Amino acid sequence: IAVLRLFGFNVYRSTYKPLLAESVVEFWNRFYYYFKELLVTFFLLPTFAGPGRKLRRWPRLRLFVAVFAAACIGNMYYHLIRLSAPLAQGDVLESILAQRSRLFYCVLLAVGIFVSMLREQRRQGQPAAAGGARRLLRIFGVWTFFATIWIWGVRGGAPFVARTEFFLGLLGLA
């Protein structure tokens, strides 16, 4: 992309206007581009091509397993490694339990990306329905999805149960 731009072509970078993304996958591709590329290279592609071969009869399940490996397991792996002190002391289980909220965030992210990918496939390459109101609704949906799952993704001292009660309170269920 950089070389094309040097030659005068007005090509957008892959991170162009992430807040105007109309799907979860599009936002993930734009906002977390380099992190996403690492997850795709080290988790999604090896899972899809390796163990995923046994799931050829079930393409949706194969895609889900590969997306789950990248967006959940790979993402969680990154966040566990950031807790180097407890891991160095051998407290692996404690490190995982300390990241319960992040694990739930990763599960929701993986499911959201998978559903978004299925919607993109269902459209079969055709553009999304036109209209300013529909476009705004799709953008609002992406923002709402990420704002909602960020309840569990943000770092802080709130335990998993408190975050879940907060979310349920937003819905009037707690």
Which residue stretches match the model-derived regions?
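Membrane-embedded transmembrane alpha-helical bundles that form the catalytic cores
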Residues: I1-A174
